[in-house]
Amino acid sequence: MKFSFVSLFPNLMEFYFKDSILARAKEKKLFKLNFYNPRDFSKNSYHKVDDYKIGGGAGLLIQAEPMYEVLRSIQEKKENPYFIFLNPSGKTFNQKDAKRLSKKEHIVFVCGRYEGIDERVLEIFANEVFSIGDFILTGGELPALVMCDAILRNVNGVLGNMESLEEESFENNLFEAPAFSKPFIFEKKNKKFYTPSEFLKGNHARIASLKTTLASCKTKFFRPDLFLEHERKK
């Protein structure tokens, strides 16, 4: 699988893939990375890519020409690029999208800055437009990294234990059950906090049943909307 990032600040993203699970997956050649800077495709001597909006309005906009050129150059490599634009007006990214997109050959994340990208570029290239929530960020780089991370976790071999993926939150519209580590009794300020005793008895069937119950309770408490969706699909 291949990921390309189109950004005015590619250095902000490269570091993310240098440690931990994704670094190991990259070393195993489970995915490839490319970074493109629209400034390199600007036709003016100052590599300027932004200008004021036609019709007025605050802030600067990334112009159509350099964005068109960089995306067209990616298209011409004929690596089945799937263009994803990051925009607050896009649909909210979720775990189902992460699973679906993990089957793509080549995802291109197009990251905006300033007041965004000339709308005509989206009309020409966008396969999908995503947001990661109802809030505004300085640019599309963080949402692109969030999505890339979530997608890669669904690529075979990236996680050392596929069972970890199956047990993660949002599977079957439920959060992952609460997790506990040693010590079995955690004591602070004269208060004792216990691990559920059933977890210590070694009966795997009963532990699995308790985890399902706890996952349901956790989801119902924190995200009743997800819990209702889970109940509806039973």
UniProtKB/Swiss-Prot annotation:
GO MF term (any one): tRNA (guanine(37)-N1)-methyltransferase activity
A UniProt-annotated Pfam family: tRNA_m1G_MT
Transmembrane segment boundaries: none
GO CC entries: cytosol
Keyword Cytoplasm: yes
Its biological purpose: Specifically methylates guanosine-37 in various tRNAs.
Similarity section: Belongs to the RNA methyltransferase TrmD family.
Protein name: tRNA (guanine-N(1)-)-methyltransferase
Gene (UniProt): trmD
